[in-house]
Amino acid sequence: MTDIPKLGLGTWQNTDPEECTNSVKTALEMGYEHIDTAQIYENEEEVGEGLSKAEADREDYFLASKVWIDQLSPENVKSSTKESLEKLGVDHVDLMYIHWPSGDYSPQETLKAFKELIHSGEIKNIGVSNFTPEQLDRAMEIAPKHIVANQVEMHPLLQQEELLEKCREHDITLVAYSPLARGEVFNVEELNEIAEKHDVSEAQVSLAWLMEKDNVVAIPKATSEEHIKDNFESLDLELDEEDIQKIDSIEREGRMVNPDFAPW
């Protein structure tokens, strides 16, 4: 299985140019090794600026972006990826995702184009995002050696047991976006109790719970140095069995990201 760093910096809705650049620079200098962006975020250039300002060696961080749904025809996959690399100021990304199985997505044709980008050296691995278990099965039939991750919303209020099981079955990583449930984790009683017990934040509890699981990586968005640091410190938090059981048994569900074109 491709080794994806357990904690990454998400950059969705990080649209203030200076703030975005600074957050990427701060994260890398703090020790983050995984940066996640996307074409639709319209901040690849600012992310690239942050990478450059941090003066980190390219092999020291794992960089991911995503092709938007209107660019998933074979020719657009290639041209838009080239554009992404130019904006990011790099010669390759470690992981390029199909952002949603929607729009111009055609399993056979789209994945063929992605595989060609691996052969040309522009991307190292293929990712899918927001794929259902059935869609993941289909994609894995077409590109079993190249798909390494399915990025989906996952947090204590959306635990994704079935999808995680499917990712483990295929020996790929589930990359959890919105791992703090858009701030809702601060309002979950079970997380409040565990945070108080360990004298940490609810964000750290949620992230530690995710990262404790096999095949799971988390990419919380953060812009301030304080939040970037708080999230990073979750790597040092060890939850006990009682904590994990308490979170696992939360039955309330809340999906935060649900566009009209979602496949579920």
Labelled PLM ranges:
Residues 1-61, 252, 262-263:
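N-terminal binding-site loop/beta-alpha segment at the start of enzyme catalytic domains
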Residues 9, 35-37, 93, 126, ...:
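Alpha-helix N-cap/helix-start motif at helix boundaries, enriched for small hydrophobics
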Residues 15-18, 36-46, 70-75, 103-106, ...:
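Acidic-and-aromatic substrate-binding clefts and catalytic sites of carbohydrate-active enzymes
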Residues 15-28, 73-88, 109, 136-137:
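Short, acidic/polar
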Residues 32, 90-93, 123, 215:
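A structural motif
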Residues 59-71, 94-101, 130, 154:
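A short, structured active-site edge motif that brings together acidic residues
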Residues 77-97, 116-120, 142:
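CE4/NodB-like, metal-dependent polysaccharide N-deacetylase domain
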Residues 101-264:
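Beta/alpha (TIM)-barrel catalytic core signal, keyed to glycine-rich beta->alpha loops juxtaposed to Asp/Glu
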